[in-house]
């Protein structure tokens, strides 16, 4: 990794840490972009290179961890388990992760509704799609094993399951 790339990663990490600290200490509404930039020891323009607004900063804080948690969650279901048990295994990982950071998790859950634009949006939407695709595969496998009887497409069922899960988080 070049020195320039390393400096970018260090800057990104300082911004993530500063935003997480200030959101936790002062609250999402009270923390300002200017305070976050100052705490991260970067200029306001540099901060805006990484996140368009505070909402985007929330996803800068969470995307990397959420991606790793989703990897773990999708590896949890065991072949042969009932679909419900597999789904519980997937969602349990996410629930535990969110429970470990209640203040920041509340902010994330408030801000993720309709989040579709911003510098971090594509990454977040990709993670969410990967989770829905994983649920779809579990549903498809259950259909093929004749463990669930439905003519609905696995993709439709997976989206409904995901939306119920999302609603339960709020």
Model regions: which residues?
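Short, hydrophobic secondary-structure boundary micro-motifs
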Residues: 106-108, 121, 147-152
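Hydrophobic alpha-helical connector segments
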Residues: 60, 74-104, 154-161
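Amphipathic alpha-helical segments used for helix-helix packing
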Residues: 99-119, 170
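Short coil/turn segments at alpha/beta junctions that flank glycine-rich nucleotide-binding fingerprints
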Residues: 25-29, 80, 101, 145
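Helix-turn-helix
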Residues: 14, 18, 22-56, 60
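Amphipathic alpha-helical packing segments from all-alpha helical-bundle domains
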Residues: 67-71, 118-145, 155-163
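N-terminal intrinsically disordered/low-complexity leader segments
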Residues: 1-10, 17
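Short amphipathic alpha-helical elements of helix-turn-helix/winged-helix folds
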Residues: 18-22, 97, 134
